[in-house]
Regions:
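A cross-family signal for N-terminal binding/gating loops and helix N-caps
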Residues: 1-193
């Protein structure tokens, strides 16, 4: 089997640009493993396909505003996607922008595009765009002011409501990306399970 066996054409206009309302009205593709029959249902029908003893595993972390926009000393744009907090001011991150080697600095921009007093310095380089960055101040105090909820690269519509990319059972902050498989659950559906 080759990975290319799973390639298929998906027209861009068929990709939803915002979550469906209500959440459980999203479509559900069901495969009958015995017969190979495929049926199309809605996510709220999920309990019809689960049996006693089945287990659902969920990611209950809240998505943090982990996408930061910044400016290099040259004036060029830079983007930081926070992945893992190493200490109060140090993060492992993906950084988009050329020539951001060890020692490079990025001034973080606020949501209006203005420079803030928050500066990130690249302290270690990894493969591809992976870097360790140290902020000159603890980032927790800044995230809500300067950070954006990261969206998948195929979503081009600006996010109107950050809560739409949180699951209804999200508790501890920590995800750098929305656990999209869990976005379809509603309180009523969880009670039905």
């Amino acid at each position: 089997m080759n990975v290319s066996d799973f390639d298929y054409h998906l027209p861009e206009e068929r990709i939803a640009q915002e979550p469906v309302m209500p959440r459980d009205a999203s479509r559900l593709l069901v495969l009958n493993r015995a017969s190979g029959a495929i049926t199309h249902r809605t996510f709220r029908d999920l309990p019809d396909y689960l049996r006693p003893g089945d287990v659902l595993v969920v990611n209950d972390t809240r998505v943090i505003p982990a996408r930061l926009l910044g400016r290099k000393p040259t004036g060029g744009a830079a983007e930081i996607l926070l992945l893992e907090q190493l200490d109060a001011a140090t993060w492992r991150a993906l950084i988009g922008g050329r020539r951001l080697t060890e020692g490079a600095t990025i001034t973080v921009l606020d949501k209006s595009g203005e420079a803030t007093d928050l500066v990130a310095t690249v302290i270690a380089e990894g493969p591809e765009s992976l870097r360790e960055v140290r902020f000159d101040q603890p980032l927790d105090e800044w995230l809500d002011t300067v950070g954006y909820v990261p969206l998948p690269p195929y979503i081009h519509t600006p996010l109107q409501d950050d809560e739409r990319y949180q699951t209804i059972y999200a508790r501890p902050a920590g995800s750098a990306a929305a656990p999209t498989a869990g976005l379809h659950f509603t309180p009523e559906l969880l009670l039905d399970l």
